[in-house]
Amino acid sequence: MKRVLFLTNYASPYRVHFYDELAKSMDVTVLFTDRVEDQKNRSADWFVSGGGAYRPVQLKRCVAHLLDENLCLDVTGWLKKPYDAIVICGYSSPTAILAMRWLRRRKIPFYMEVDGGLIRQERKIKYLFKRSLVRKADQWLSSGRYTTEFLVHYGAEKSRIHVYPFSSVFEKDILP
Protein backbone atom coordinates (compact mmCIF):
# COMPACT_ATOMS: atom_id res chain seq x y z
CA MET A 1 0.00 0.00 0.00
CA LYS A 2 1.30 3.48 -0.89
CA ARG A 3 2.30 5.71 2.02
CA VAL A 4 1.56 9.44 1.83
CA LEU A 5 2.47 12.20 4.28
CA PHE A 6 0.62 15.54 4.37
CA LEU A 7 1.75 18.64 6.28
CA THR A 8 -0.99 21.19 6.90
CA ASN A 9 -2.13 23.72 9.47
CA TYR A 10 -5.31 22.37 11.12
CA ALA A 11 -8.08 19.84 10.62
CA SER A 12 -10.68 21.75 8.60
CA PRO A 13 -13.84 19.71 7.90
CA TYR A 14 -13.43 19.48 4.13
CA ARG A 15 -9.81 18.38 4.52
CA VAL A 16 -10.68 15.75 7.14
CA HIS A 17 -13.21 14.21 4.74
CA PHE A 18 -10.65 14.36 1.92
CA TYR A 19 -8.03 12.56 4.03
CA ASP A 20 -10.57 9.94 5.13
CA GLU A 21 -11.53 9.24 1.51
CA LEU A 22 -7.91 9.09 0.37
CA ALA A 23 -7.03 6.73 3.23
CA LYS A 24 -9.43 4.15 1.82
CA SER A 25 -6.87 3.41 -0.89
CA MET A 26 -3.53 4.30 0.76
CA ASP A 27 -1.79 4.77 4.11
CA VAL A 28 -2.25 8.49 4.94
CA THR A 29 -0.53 10.36 7.76
CA VAL A 30 -1.41 14.03 8.32
CA LEU A 31 0.79 16.34 10.37
CA PHE A 32 -1.01 19.35 11.88
CA THR A 33 0.96 22.44 12.91
CA ASP A 34 -1.91 24.21 14.70
CA ARG A 35 -4.27 22.98 17.37
CA VAL A 36 -8.00 23.32 16.78
CA GLU A 37 -8.49 25.01 20.16
CA ASP A 38 -6.08 27.78 19.13
CA GLN A 39 -8.17 28.81 16.13
CA LYS A 40 -9.75 32.14 17.00
CA ASN A 41 -11.42 32.72 13.62
CA ARG A 42 -13.56 29.58 13.82
CA SER A 43 -16.13 28.23 16.21
CA ALA A 44 -15.19 24.87 17.74
CA ASP A 45 -18.40 23.51 16.16
CA TRP A 46 -16.95 24.09 12.69
CA PHE A 47 -14.28 21.42 13.20
CA VAL A 48 -15.06 17.74 12.83
CA SER A 49 -13.07 14.72 13.82
CA GLY A 50 -12.07 12.26 11.15
CA GLY A 51 -13.60 8.89 10.60
CA GLY A 52 -10.39 7.24 11.70
CA ALA A 53 -9.21 6.22 8.25
CA TYR A 54 -6.07 8.38 8.28
CA ARG A 55 -3.45 8.92 10.99
CA PRO A 56 -3.61 12.45 12.48
CA VAL A 57 -0.47 13.75 14.23
CA GLN A 58 -0.37 16.99 16.19
CA LEU A 59 3.13 18.44 15.92
CA LYS A 60 4.72 20.04 18.96
CA ARG A 61 5.14 23.79 18.93
CA CYS A 62 8.68 24.98 19.38
CA VAL A 63 8.03 28.63 18.76
CA ALA A 64 4.42 29.65 19.17
CA HIS A 65 2.90 32.46 17.20
CA LEU A 66 5.95 33.38 15.17
CA LEU A 67 4.33 35.99 12.92
CA ASP A 68 1.03 34.48 14.12
CA GLU A 69 2.20 31.04 12.94
CA ASN A 70 3.71 28.04 14.70
CA LEU A 71 7.16 26.64 14.05
CA CYS A 72 7.25 22.91 14.73
CA LEU A 73 10.79 21.57 14.61
CA ASP A 74 9.67 17.96 15.10
CA VAL A 75 8.41 17.94 11.50
CA THR A 76 11.88 16.83 10.35
CA GLY A 77 11.59 13.60 12.33
CA TRP A 78 8.51 12.72 10.30
CA LEU A 79 10.16 13.70 7.02
CA LYS A 80 12.95 11.17 7.66
CA LYS A 81 10.49 8.27 7.45
CA PRO A 82 9.93 6.48 4.13
CA TYR A 83 6.93 7.72 2.12
CA ASP A 84 5.88 7.26 -1.48
CA ALA A 85 4.78 10.91 -1.57
CA ILE A 86 5.11 13.95 0.68
CA VAL A 87 2.62 16.78 0.26
CA ILE A 88 3.20 20.21 1.78
CA CYS A 89 -0.13 22.06 1.96
CA GLY A 90 0.58 25.74 1.38
CA TYR A 91 3.98 27.36 1.24
CA SER A 92 4.21 30.24 3.69
CA SER A 93 4.06 28.92 7.24
CA PRO A 94 7.35 28.67 9.14
CA THR A 95 6.94 24.90 9.49
CA ALA A 96 6.19 24.47 5.76
CA ILE A 97 9.25 26.55 4.87
CA LEU A 98 11.42 24.48 7.23
CA ALA A 99 10.03 21.25 5.73
CA MET A 100 10.60 22.39 2.13
CA ARG A 101 14.18 23.49 2.84
CA TRP A 102 14.91 20.25 4.70
CA LEU A 103 13.53 18.14 1.84
CA ARG A 104 15.36 20.13 -0.87
CA ARG A 105 18.70 19.83 0.94
CA ARG A 106 18.29 16.06 1.00
CA LYS A 107 17.01 15.93 -2.59
CA ILE A 108 13.74 14.35 -1.46
CA PRO A 109 10.98 15.19 -3.94
CA PHE A 110 7.70 16.61 -2.67
CA TYR A 111 4.40 18.02 -3.86
CA MET A 112 3.00 21.39 -2.90
CA GLU A 113 -0.78 21.49 -2.58
CA VAL A 114 -2.49 24.85 -2.93
CA ASP A 115 -6.22 25.39 -2.53
CA GLY A 116 -6.70 28.86 -4.00
CA GLY A 117 -4.66 32.01 -4.17
CA LEU A 118 -5.04 35.55 -5.43
CA ILE A 119 -2.60 37.23 -7.76
CA ARG A 120 -2.13 40.76 -6.46
CA GLN A 121 0.08 43.71 -7.17
CA GLU A 122 2.84 43.48 -4.61
CA ARG A 123 6.34 44.71 -3.96
CA LYS A 124 8.99 42.97 -6.00
CA ILE A 125 10.73 41.59 -2.91
CA LYS A 126 7.50 39.95 -1.72
CA TYR A 127 6.86 38.51 -5.19
CA LEU A 128 10.40 37.10 -5.37
CA PHE A 129 10.10 35.59 -1.90
CA LYS A 130 6.79 33.89 -2.75
CA ARG A 131 8.25 32.71 -6.04
CA SER A 132 11.27 31.20 -4.28
CA LEU A 133 8.94 29.25 -1.98
CA VAL A 134 6.53 28.03 -4.66
CA ARG A 135 9.38 26.92 -6.92
CA LYS A 136 10.83 24.64 -4.24
CA ALA A 137 8.30 21.89 -5.02
CA ASP A 138 8.93 19.20 -7.59
CA GLN A 139 5.25 18.98 -8.51
CA TRP A 140 2.10 20.84 -7.54
CA LEU A 141 -1.49 19.88 -6.74
CA SER A 142 -4.04 22.48 -7.76
CA SER A 143 -7.73 22.61 -6.89
CA GLY A 144 -8.66 24.37 -10.15
CA ARG A 145 -7.96 26.86 -12.90
CA TYR A 146 -7.41 29.96 -10.74
CA THR A 147 -5.10 28.10 -8.40
CA THR A 148 -3.13 26.87 -11.42
CA GLU A 149 -2.82 30.47 -12.68
CA PHE A 150 -1.62 31.49 -9.20
CA LEU A 151 1.01 28.73 -9.15
CA VAL A 152 2.28 29.55 -12.66
CA HIS A 153 2.47 33.25 -11.74
CA TYR A 154 4.78 32.32 -8.87
CA GLY A 155 7.03 30.04 -10.89
CA ALA A 156 5.46 26.59 -10.95
CA GLU A 157 5.96 24.67 -14.18
CA LYS A 158 2.53 24.20 -15.75
CA SER A 159 3.45 20.75 -17.08
CA ARG A 160 4.04 19.55 -13.50
CA ILE A 161 0.81 20.93 -12.03
CA HIS A 162 -1.84 18.28 -11.37
CA VAL A 163 -5.41 19.54 -11.09
CA TYR A 164 -7.59 17.34 -8.94
CA PRO A 165 -11.34 17.56 -8.38
CA PHE A 166 -11.52 18.83 -4.83
CA SER A 167 -14.98 18.92 -3.31
CA SER A 168 -16.59 18.31 0.04
CA VAL A 169 -19.81 17.17 -1.63
CA PHE A 170 -20.52 13.46 -1.27
CA GLU A 171 -22.74 11.36 -3.50
CA LYS A 172 -25.33 11.18 -0.70
CA ASP A 173 -25.52 15.02 -0.74
CA ILE A 174 -26.61 15.19 -4.39
CA LEU A 175 -30.31 15.53 -4.98
CA PRO A 176 -31.97 12.91 -7.23
What name fits each language-model region?
Residues 13-16, 94-97, 148-149:
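Short, well-ordered alpha-helical microsegments
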Residues 50-73, 88-89:
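A short, charged, and often flexible helix/loop element on the N-terminal side
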